């Protein structure tokens, strides 16, 4: 055998031998895909009310901390729009997540399935946006107060804001779960 191009002969590499050794998937792999999907859907069914419950807890804490933030003239939460906004949105978030948690655990359907899924998805997104909006509006005011004097009023305001941010994170995760549920339904 002559080599007209005068090139080295090509040797078989480990990658090529590994590719030859791999076999076609067995018919049983389809069932494992189905069971993986069932496990994923079961995990989402369990995680969604848990994230809403966590949001309920943090929203309630933000509400209670902000309401109790009264420390005399110039140090009352109700003298500042930003803090009143955090209070109002934490009340809305508490009511929304309490209603969603009650609806889930009572197994009652207030709407048909399609409407309920749409309400879950849109409600989670709207309330999550309101939570982060309220927190982001109050952060600059709290930072300005901390530059002048760091006291219990600013600490309470900062803790209420952080609870609102934690509630946002929990509700944003719940919105992801709601979006997944919405995308997997066949009525879309």
Curated annotation (Swiss-Prot):
It is a multi-pass membrane protein. It comes from the Eukaryota. Residues 1-34 are annotated as: Disordered. The keyword Lyase does not apply. It is found in: Cell membrane. The keyword Ribosomal protein does not apply. Residues 1-46, 106-120, 178-188 are cytoplasmic. Residues 68-84, 142-156 are extracellular. This is CASP-like protein 4B1. Residues 24-34 have a biased composition (Polar residues). GO terms for cellular component: plasma membrane. Homodimer and heterodimers. It comes from Arabidopsis lyrata subsp. lyrata (Lyre-leaved rock-cress). It holds the Pfam family CASP_dom. The chain crosses the membrane at residues 47-67, 85-105, 121-141, 157-177. Its main location: membrane. Keywords: Cell membrane, Membrane, Transmembrane, Transmembrane helix.
């Amino acid at each position: 055998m002559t080599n007209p191009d005068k090139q080295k002969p090509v040797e078989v590499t480990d990658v090529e031998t590994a590719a030859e050794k791999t076999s076609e998937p067995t018919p049983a792999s389809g069932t494992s895909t189905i069971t993986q999907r069932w496990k994923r859907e079961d995990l989402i069914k369990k995680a969604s009310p848990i994230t809403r419950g966590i949001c309920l807890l943090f929203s309630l804490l933000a509400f209670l901390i902000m309401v109790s933030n009264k420390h005399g003239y110039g140090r009352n939460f109700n003298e500042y729009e930003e803090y009143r906004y955090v209070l109002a949105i934490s009340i809305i978030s508490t009511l929304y997540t309490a209603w969603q948690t009650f609806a889930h655990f009572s197994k009652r359907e207030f709407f048909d399935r399609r409407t309920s899924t749409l309400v879950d998805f849109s409600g989670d997104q709207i309330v999550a946006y309101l939570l982060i909006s309220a927190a982001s509006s109050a952060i600059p005011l709290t930072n300005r107060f901390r530059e002048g004097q760091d006291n219990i009023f600013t600490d309470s305001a900062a803790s209420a804001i952080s609870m609102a941010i934690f509630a946002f994170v929990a509700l944003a995760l719940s919105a992801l779960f709601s979006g997944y549920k919405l995308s997997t339904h066949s009525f879309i």
